[in-house]
Amino acid sequence: MATQSKKTLYDFTVKDAKGNDVDLSVYKGKVVLIVNVASKCGLTNNSYDELNQIYLKYKEKGFEILAFPCNQFGQQEPGTNEEIVDFVCTKFKSEFPIFDKIDVNGENAAPVYEFLKTGFYGILGGDIQWNFSKFLVDKNGQPVDCYYPTTSPLTVERDIQKLLGLL
């Protein structure tokens, strides 16, 4: 009987903000920070500012941020994908990819988020708690840590450096 291999981030295909399929295997070999984002949250300004700082500092070293808009928390991401991308790219000058708006909890939760949450039930209580929850994924496509919404993206920098082999 063949042994089924362990799932990785690279086993998933998601939609970008324009509705095109993106095979996450394109991020193979990179350290990835995955964040559920919202435009009208109290955490928005600081989170995007710090995510941009980290992205610009490490993108050439094998680091990527994947942002997934989500409207499940306080209806704080009500816009269309086009409006969200325009907001993020205009106001914050973000260069990292913004994907299709998704659910991160419940029966319609995106499969990639079901995968990310596996193994972090004790920390998360089984569900994402709010906007700007963060998952750090290693170069092998395995989630290695998760961070609360209130955890500053800059606080995650040392963990990113370790996974990139910079420490």
Curated annotation (Swiss-Prot):
EC numbers for this chain: 1.11.1.9
Q: What are the protein's UniProt keywords?
A: Oxidoreductase, Peroxidase
- Biological processes per GO annotation: response to oxidative stress
InterPro entries on file = Glutathione_peroxidase, GPX_AS, GPX_CS, Thioredoxin-like_sf, Thioredoxin_domain
Catalytic reaction annotation:
2 glutathione + H2O2 = glutathione disulfide + 2 H2O
> What EC class is this?
oxidoreductase
Q: What molecular functions are annotated in GO for this chain?
A: glutathione peroxidase activity
- One Pfam family in the UniProt entry: GSHPx
Q: Where is the active site?
A: 41
**What family classification does the UniProt entry report for this protein?**
Belongs to the glutathione peroxidase family.
| Purpose | May constitute a glutathione peroxidase-like protective system against oxidative stresses.
Q: What is this protein called?
A: Glutathione peroxidase 1
Which organism's genome codes for this protein? Helianthus annuus (Common sunflower)
**The gene coding this protein:** GPXHA-1
